[in-house]
Amino acid sequence: MRVIFSGGGTGGHIYPIMALIERLKEEGICQDDEILFVGTKKGLESKIVPAAGVNFKTIDIQGFDRKHLLNNVKTIQLFLKATKRAKEILADFQPDVVLGTGGYVSGAIVYEASKMKIPTMIHESNSVVGVANKFLGHYVDKICYTFDDAAKEFPEKKKLVKTGNPRSQQVLSLNAKPVDLAGDLGLNPKIPTVLVFGGSRGALAINRVMLKSLMELKKKPYQVIWATGTYYYDAIEKKLADVDYDDSIKVVPYIDNMPGLLPEMTCVVSRSGATSLAEFTALGVPVILIPSPNVTHNHQMKNAMDLEKAGAALVIAEDDLNENTFVSSIDHLLLDQSYDEKMRQASKALGVPDASDQVIKVMKEIAKKN
């Protein structure tokens, strides 16, 4: 089966595709030369995809600028060129299926594929549907989704298939080496441990509240792993030189082996991007979510609220984030074992351990109709 994948800009658009590619190869459904990822030169995908050894081509495209309307003249010009480039890629590669996960680049290639009568589908990882996926929903053959709230935004219900996020299955199948809390991090494996992190680059609001909470956290009967993010690590290290905190708080720039660490955690404090939530629910990890307000359509808050409604998370809005709400939320989770266990069960119930297989099943079905 020959497949073109497209998604751009953020990890939430890229990592589900990478999980699908891995599974397609594992099952012998696709060979390396039967898979193509179409993205942009500027997006995160331009680094991640080629580094993984996946065939990669680019389309030059940008989104509409709602503040500076004159900039949209260039946007329209780029879109017209993008559709021409998309046609060339499709004609050259001759895919059996084209799947998009979001981002303007996927809008161009998936739309053109649908016009050429090539089987098409999209996958929506968030609880709020992005602009590209909302547009493409009218043209594709199938729509895969993770959150029920997202399904409500698509008018053509016959196209909908609830599959979950492919990253869930990938995390469970990694067989990652468990992190040795004592040997690797100098922590006590016998006491509760909380991981605090804001993504690979870090989150300023989370780092600020951690700095303010250190003196209170050192008094607690649990320990903390604080992943500051690579962007903030050096500055925080300088500030910590004058702070009297003890060995129960381990400060690191980044977590290299997240699948190996998460099962060892009593709870996690995190942003609420779709990929992270797929990992948490797959493993049944209790979470305190601090959604980023700096995302389109406030989708991280909607993602987080869906988990909270299911009893799988506590949510702190960034506007409400302070030392008191932060520490008291951790206390509530770590010091009440019955609450912790209920949240683990609720989180695990939301996970989809065969999400990749479910998406691939849909891919095969629409490819047969070609």
UniProtKB/Swiss-Prot annotation:
It is found in: Cell membrane. It holds the Pfam family Glyco_tran_28_C. Pathway: Cell wall biogenesis; peptidoglycan biosynthesis. Gene3D superfamilies: Glycogen Phosphorylase B (3.40.50.2000). One of its GO terms (molecular function) is undecaprenyldiphospho-muramoylpentapeptide beta-N-acetylglucosaminyltransferase activity. NCBIfam families: murG (TIGR01133). This is UDP-N-acetylglucosamine--N-acetylmuramyl-(pentapeptide) pyrophosphoryl-undecaprenol N-acetylglucosamine transferase. It comes from Lactobacillus delbrueckii subsp. bulgaricus (strain ATCC 11842 / DSM 20081 / BCRC 10696 / JCM 1002 / NBRC 13953 / NCIMB 11778 / NCTC 12712 / WDCM 00102 / Lb 14). The gene is murG.
